[in-house]
Amino acid sequence: AKYLKAIGALRGGQLVEVTRADLVGRYVGHTAPLTNSVIQSALGGVLFIDEAYALYRGGEDSFGLEAIDTLVKGIEDHRDDLVVILAGYTKEMQLFLSANSGLASRFPNQIEFPDYSGEELYKILCSIAKGKGYTLDDACKLPLVTYFDRKQVEDAATNGNGRMARNTLEKAILNQSKRLVADPDASLELLLPGDFELE
C-alpha cells in the first residue's frame, strides 16, 4: 500500500486486512453495513481479503452472498480510490469468483504463487529457528527436505506452506525441551534430527 501511494496510484497508504468474520454479519441486515464500513476504512488504500473464498459457502449462504454483492458494488463505485486484493487457494478461489457474475470481471489480474519446495520450506524453517535462537544440526537437512517434499505432494493446500514449516519447528522445540530434561548438558540452541516429528 505504501508503494502504491509513493508512485501516486493511491492517495492513502493504509492496508486493511480482513477475513469473512470482518465482512459477514451474524444477523439479517448486518452484513451490508459491516462490509460497507470495511470498504470505507480502506478507501485511498488497499483492502486485502484473506481466504476470500470463505465468503462463499454455497447457494444457501445468503450472508456471504450479500457480502460479495456489497463488495462488487463498492469495488465498482470506488474503482479509482481502492485496490482490492483477494487471497486464497486456487481451486477455492475459482469457485468463489463464480459466485457473482460481476466478481470475476472486477479482478482481471490473477497471480498464482506456486507452493514452496521442500528446500524452500527448509530454509524458511531455518530462518524462523534462527530468529528464535536455535540452529539445526546439519543432519536435519535431508530428512526435513524429504519430509516437506512429500507433504507438499500429498496436499499442499492443507499444509499451509510456511505455516507447515513453523508448526514443524514448534513441535521440534517442544521435543528438544523433553530431550534436554534427560540430557541437561546438551546444547540449548541445537536441534537434532530426532527432535523433528517426520511421520
Outline where the language-model segments fall:
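Walker A/P-loop
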Residues: 1-13, 37-43, 107
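C-terminal helical "lid" subdomain and adjoining coupling/linker elements of P-loop NTPases
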Residues: 136, 151-199
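Flexible beta-alpha connector loops of hexameric P-loop NTPases
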Residues: 20-31, 54-65, 110-114
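Conserved nucleotide-binding/hydrolysis micro-motifs of P-loop NTPases
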Residues: 22-24, 53-55, 89-94, 115-121
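Conserved post-Walker A coupling segment in P-loop NTPases
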Residues: 4-28
